[in-house]
Amino acid sequence: VPGHLLDAFLKPASVAVYGASDAPGSFAGRILENLKEGGFPGALVPVNPEHRTAGGLPCVPSLVASGQRVDLAVLAAPARTLPALVRDCAAAGVKGAVVASADGPAAQRQVTPELVAEANRAGLRLLGPGSLGVVRPSAHLNATFSAGQTLPGSLALVSQSGALCTTILDWAAERALGFSLVLAVGDEVDLDLGEVLEGVAVDEQTRGVLLYVEDVRRARSFLSGLKVAARLKPVVVLRAGRYPGPLTPPGPRGADVVFDAALARTGAVRATTVGQLFAAGQLLATGHRVGGSRLAIVTNARGPTMLALDRAVELGITLPPVSEATRAALDAGLPPAGSHLNPVDVQGDAGPERYALAVGACLRDPGFDAVLAMLAPQVPVPPLEMAERLTALARGAPTPLLACLMGGARIRPAREALARAGVPEFRSPELAVEAFGFLARYRLHQAQLLEVPGPLAPGSGPDVARARAVVQTSLGLGLSALPRKPARELLEAFGIPCRSTPTPRGGQGRELHVQVIRDPVFGPAIHFGLGGSPRTGLHETLVALPPLNAVLVRAALVGSSTEAFLREHEGARRAATEA
């Protein structure tokens, strides 16, 4: 989209590097070298009044003094110099600046709100402080101090941690996985996660997004940007700092269950480990989408398949039986021993032909949303030939193919062949199932986004005068909380019916609690779950963000202990959840 605020960071025609020098260990010098090694085609301008050259290029004392026009600047100089450098950028007409100073908190203290406002008035946006920088492989732009170059691809990586970015980039290089862009936001004194996500959403090179979050600094912007991005392409979020500790960023944290509820309302899905984020990245990079949660498994090993089945049950992934046509093809081509249902067991002595027959039959079955091919390195199995067969089957197949090749040295050439062909491959059964689960949950969340809660009382608006009178009367009495009767009057003034709530008797009723709690980050959150006596042993509390309707409430209940309790329980009939 022309004119987006990320253009200066992703499409610069020229880059200035402040602080660049040829001194050994120079932070800015490493950034300049990365830009040169990556083959950046535009002008590179080292800015350093104390050096004549850097990286074989002439240094200028300042951009204003040089009169050169620059789109993007990288500020990798000492923290005490940052205010002057930001003002030099603003005066020279720079549109984007990465504050990559390695001075940590000192840099954050120097880049004050007043300095940010001054830069913004000049049309300059700041990324950082503490930002690793920006990588745009298709433009040969590596404006970071990270070693190595990144392959171009369709996956965006957006992170609050530069260290995690470098970790993921190193992991991706081993698997020949490319990126559309890599951007570390740092301390977000100006450009924040939400604004970055809005830019990523409309980036034509990006088909999937990996997002690492430690704390949400501007909740409204974050949720808005995340919702826009997740509406257009899958977004998988990994959040650290779920529990307080010495490394937890300062400021309000908010409850992790509320963060989960917020993600569900944006359409994004959540990973809980770096391994899961890697797995999601492998699948998102293919651009595959799924229509549901129906998975077929083809395997030559019973034990690992049982692990995959356990994880599928935990994630709500279904394994429906094969169709009659698929069953006929399997019966004709496979030995009678082993399962011809789902999972399909080709047996441990299966060669490439038998294995490929089963995988191909499942890929053609319209009853599946994806096929997982699992392979253990048993004696007769030639892994590389198996990988070549899988690559041929995946090419042009109507259904996504995932591979799980278990083992080490014997399997490595097969893994490399699959990576070159763009077939997502996973080291363990659980990760393969989890990767598919991310796409299945993404589809579910997108469907839930279409649910728009309707008015509680059609045809009538709120009685604001009555509500105001209730509140003013209570305040006049010196009350800090509304008693039951005024509280009911207040709710009824807004069209919320209040029914009597007798204690369930006779063993047939269920008691639930509903509470609205203000989260310090995301605001009002609805907590609900089991009420009454704790004898059930179920203490689960579910959380959702308003507004809600019946469909969204039922979606929050799915798979929960509360849902199980509302079904037939200890002789009591199923609760009337439709009410």
Listing of model-derived features with the role each one plays in the protein:
Residues 1-579:
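Catalytic-core regions of core metabolic enzymes
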